[in-house]
């Protein structure tokens, strides 16, 4: 029943992945008994047909699931659409973090010591937390989902690199903001890495951090 509900709700297939072996095993028991009831000739045809279908299915799945299509190609776009847009979200994250690191390096030394990186979404925050340590970046500050529970650090940052936010948000949240860079990817593929492409360096949060943080929690 959960499997049927997931199909009806068009949920992501891998959420049910731990249940697939159980479902396959249950089907295999029934299938084995059914094939055993057939004549040897029919059983042989069924077995060969099954193996051929599995081989074709494996090739099709590999073409769609594995990252082997050239990014931006027709094949890639078809696979991306079949996967619900997951492929395009794999593009550009290292470049994003490298751009943030370059902006950090351009700041005065005294500003780097109390630096924070405010990310709009869990994608940006995850990329910063994954690739950032090798570049000496601090952990991302993010209000989305469970990232909000991790807070903004102690002591709170004084200089903030704002990623993925609109200019209106940056200017309303901070007293001073300047565009310091832009987000892009070498394939020109539009995804959440290049949504709100400006990266800002901001100073002087207009509210105390605890008050700002209480109103900054959101879900997505």
Label for each model-derived stretch:
Residues 4-48:
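Hydrophobic/aromatic-rich transmembrane helices and adjacent perimembrane loops
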Residues 112-117, 158-160:
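Short active-site oxyanion
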Residues 154-166:
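Short, well-ordered secondary-structure micro-motifs within conserved domains or adaptor modules
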Residues 146-156:
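Short, flexible loop segments at boundaries between secondary-structure elements
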């Amino acid at each position: 029943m959960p499997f049927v509900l997931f199909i009806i709700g068009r949920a992501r297939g891998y959420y049910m992945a731990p249940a697939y072996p159980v479902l396959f095993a249950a089907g295999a028991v029934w299938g084995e008994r059914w094939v055993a009831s057939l004549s040897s000739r029919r059983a042989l045809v069924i077995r060969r047909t099954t193996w051929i279908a599995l081989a074709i299915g494996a090739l099709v799945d590999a073409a769609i699931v594995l990252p082997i299509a050239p990014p931006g190609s027709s094949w890639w776009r078809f696979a991306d659409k079949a996967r619900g847009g997951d492929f395009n979200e794999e593009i550009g994250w290292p470049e994003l973090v490298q751009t943030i690191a370059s902006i950090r390096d351009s700041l005065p030394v005294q500003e780097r010591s109390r630096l924070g990186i405010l990310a709009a979404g869990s994608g940006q925050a995850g990329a910063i937390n994954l690739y950032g340590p090798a570049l000496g970046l601090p952990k991302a500050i993010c209000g989305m989902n469970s990232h909000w529970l991790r807070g903004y650090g102690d002591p709170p940052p004084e200089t903030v690199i704002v990623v993925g936010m609109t200019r209106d948000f940056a200017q309303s949240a901070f007293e001073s903001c300047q565009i310091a860079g832009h987000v892009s990817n070498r394939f020109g593929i539009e995804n959440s890495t290049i949504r709100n492409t400006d990266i800002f360096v901001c100073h002087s949060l207009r509210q105390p951090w605890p008050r700002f943080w209480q109103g900054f929690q959101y879900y997505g």
